[in-house]
Amino acid sequence: MKIAVTGKGGVGKTTFAATLARLYADEGKHVLAADVDPDANLGLALGFDEETLDSIIPITKMRKLIEERTGAGADNQFYTLNPKVSDIPDTYSKMANGVRLLVLGTVETGGGGCVCPEHVMLRRIINNLVLHRDDVVILDMEAGLEHLGR
């Protein structure tokens, strides 16, 4: 099952996503929670400790990996829409309280550029996941609806 929690800002999307993730984990499901909100707080809401949160590398910080997989770079305006991503959830997520967490990241500064290749990577990760009966993916999305059109 794949669930995207989306909507207006400040309405409790992160709290709801974290609650769903913990409830499914408590039921014995294999849960992957993806924090797609640039104001990433899902890890805190899930009860991850600071040391674990600090050790998570957001997808937006994986510049070399993104360039290798998508061909995106400073000199290239085009990028691959179907990069290899099958290893990313297991390699780059962290586990706490029965929930694996994957973080997209954010734009660090104004004028920092588009995070389109990063969104492509995340979309491919979510689409590529082969789910079994006890697998659940929870996406804590950014406010608004623009990301649904990407």
Question: At which residue positions do the language-model features occur?
Answer:
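Switch II (G3) loop of P-loop NTPases
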Residues: V103-V115, I126-G149
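Hydrophobic anchor at the beta1->P-loop junction of P-loop NTPases
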Residues: V5
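N-terminal phosphate/diphosphate-binding loop that engages ATP/GTP or pyrophosphate donors
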Residues: L23-N97
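Residue-level preference for the first positions of well-ordered beta-strands
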Residues: K2, H30, L101, V136-I138
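Conserved lysine of the Walker
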Residues: K13
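Walker A (P-loop) phosphate-binding loop of P-loop NTPases
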Residues: G10
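Hydrophobic positions on the alpha1 helix immediately C-terminal to the Walker A/P-loop
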Residues: F16
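Switch I (G2) and immediately adjacent beta-strands of P-loop GTPase domains
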Residues: V85-G105, N127-H132
